[in-house]
Structure formats: C-alpha cells, structure tokens
C-alpha cells in the first residue's frame, strides 16, 4: 500500500463516496416514510419489479440505462447520478484534504494520521448531505448518521496522530451533554421545543471526532451561520405572510405543507452544524487565530 500513488486512492475514495451517495438516496427517500432500508429490496416505484444489482451501480447504472428504468422505461431522475457524483467528489476531497492538498498526485500516502484524517473528513463531508436533505425537509436526523458518527469518532481516535480516545470520549459526552442541557434550558425559558435530540447526537459525533474544543467551535460557527441565514429568511417569511393576509389565496393543502416543513418560519439547526463541522475540522485553528488577531490586534 505504501507504493500506491495518491491518484489511485483518490479514485478509490471517489468510488466509495459514490456508493455512499447511492445508499444516501435510499436513506433520504425511505427513512422519513418509515420504510425499512433493507426490505423491500430496490425496486421500480411504478411496476414494483426488483432492480438487478448491476443496474444499481452508482452513476454507471443510470448511464447504462440512459436515464430510463429497464422494466417499464419510465424516466429515472437525474438527481440520482448527480447526488452520487457529488458524494464521489466529496469522498475524493476527503483524502485530498487529509493529504495536505498539493499538486503531486504521484506521491504515496504513508502516514497513519493521514488515513485517520481522511476517514474523519469522509464522514464529515458525506454525512452533511443526508443531514441537510432530511433535516431540512422532515426535521429529523437519521441515527445512521449521528450514532454512526459517534462510533466512527471513537474508533478513529485509536489511530495515532490525532486526538486520544479519552479526548474523543470526553468530546462526545461533553459536546452532546452540553447541547442537551442548553436545549433543555431554552425549552423551559421559551416554553416550546428549542432543540431536537438529533442535533444533540450529531454534535456528540463531532465531539468524538474533534474533541470538546472542535465541537464548541463548530457549534459557535453553526450558530453564526444560522443567524446570517435566519434573519433575512425571517424577513422574507414575514413579508410573504403580510401579502397573504392582504388577499393572497393559498390552498389548505399548501398551507398544511408549509406548516409541516417550515414550522414557525424556522430552518432546522442540523444543516448548519453539518456545514460548519468540516470547515472547522480543516481550518478551525487558522480561523480562530484570524479572529483573535482581528479582535485583539
């Protein structure tokens, strides 16, 4: 393995990312609907015929079928290969960033910490996709992402060069526990649910990967991103609500859907955590130094 060049492993990580992206398509569709991820097997949604495994190959399957199902020739959304390609690129980016970027793709990947960082970035980048998609639309974060993230963080800490297993365990407990306590207090003060338990488990996973400091930095950056997005979003929602009150007519079904997906005009917090985490994992120390230098001169 020591003699295999970086470009080869980038292709491997692209393929792994595309496979994960294909599985995420299943998660995004099935979990919010309460459908098992295993049964029934992949099948055509129209005629219910089982899809052979060779047609399920990420990206290749869609190209092979020319964007139409083999059984009843119905169009297959291009979103599927686009999502798989994006996840493939994110998978390759995970290893590329862990190896220090650079232009020499012929160098071998030797250091154990490089593989540990690549595994961490792989989960951070690939996990962001279903968190953003599912949490925004359905206001839930799959346990297959948050809980697996905690386990992955604890296992990665066993590789020398990163945080220690104790730091990883403390990061998971203190980050998750701290956010749970913060949400509990906010719920009591505001007299309504202020924090979902999915966010708690997600931050616990980030704590397991980055330690307490990294998780706290991620939480702060996510909160700032949330403010930057929610302020203009809230203004737009209020303006739209005023327009409706002045005579705009919407169907009851549309109103019910709006209420379900955008309750109280709010966007779930999970996507902001998922975006902030890989940024802080890569550049947290540098960004913190810039902030300190800017504030304190």
Model regions: which residues?
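Membrane-interface helix-boundary signature
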Residues: 6-9, 73, 110-120, 142, ...
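Hydrophobic alpha-helical transmembrane segments
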Residues: 1-18, 154-161, 274-297
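Functional transmembrane core segments of multi-pass inner-membrane proteins
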Residues: 105-108, 112-113, 117-230, 234, ...
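Membrane-embedded alpha-helical segments in integral membrane proteins
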Residues: 86-106, 152-156, 284
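Interfacial loop-to-transmembrane junctions
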Residues: 197-198, 235, 239-240, 244-247, ...
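Select subsegments of transmembrane alpha-helices in polytopic membrane proteins
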Residues: 78-85, 143
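Membrane-proximal soluble regions of multi-pass membrane proteins
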Residues: 24-79, 246-261, 269
């Amino acid at each position: 393995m020591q003699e295999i060049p970086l470009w080869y492993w980038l292709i491997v990580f692209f393929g792994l990312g595309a496979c994960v992206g294909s599985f995420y398509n299943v998660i995004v569709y099935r979990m919010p609907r309460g459908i098992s991820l295993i049964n029934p097997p992949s099948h055509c949604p129209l005629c219910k015929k089982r899809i052979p495994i060779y047609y399920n190959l990420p990206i290749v399957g869609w190209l092979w079928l020319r964007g139409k199902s083999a059984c009843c020739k119905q169009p297959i959304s291009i979103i599927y290969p686009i999502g798989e390609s994006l996840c493939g690129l994110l998978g390759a980016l995970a290893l590329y960033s862990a190896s220090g970027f650079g232009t020499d793709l012929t160098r071998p990947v030797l250091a154990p910490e490089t593989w540990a960082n690549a595994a961490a970035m792989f989960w951070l980048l690939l996990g962001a996709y279903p968190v953003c998609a599912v949490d925004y639309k359905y206001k839930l974060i799959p346990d297959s992402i948050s809980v697996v993230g905690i386990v992955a963080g604890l296992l990665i800490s066993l590789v020398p060069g990163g945080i220690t297993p104790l730091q990883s365990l403390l990061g998971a407990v203190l980050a998750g526990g701290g956010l749970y306590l913060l949400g509990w207090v906010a719920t009591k003060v505001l007299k309504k649910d202020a924090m979902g338990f999915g966010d708690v488990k997600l931050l616990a996973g980030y704590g397991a990967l980055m330690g307490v400091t990294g998780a706290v930095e991620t939480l702060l950056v996510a909160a700032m991103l949330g403010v930057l997005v929610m302020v203009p979003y809230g203004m737009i929602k209020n303006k739209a609500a005023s327009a409706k009150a002045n005579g705009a007519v919407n169907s009851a079904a549309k109103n019910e859907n709006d209420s379900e997906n955008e309750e109280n005009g709010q966007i779930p917090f999970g996507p902001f955590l998922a975006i902030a985490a890989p940024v802080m994992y890569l550049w947290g120390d540098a960004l913190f130094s810039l902030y300190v230098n800017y504030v304190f001169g």
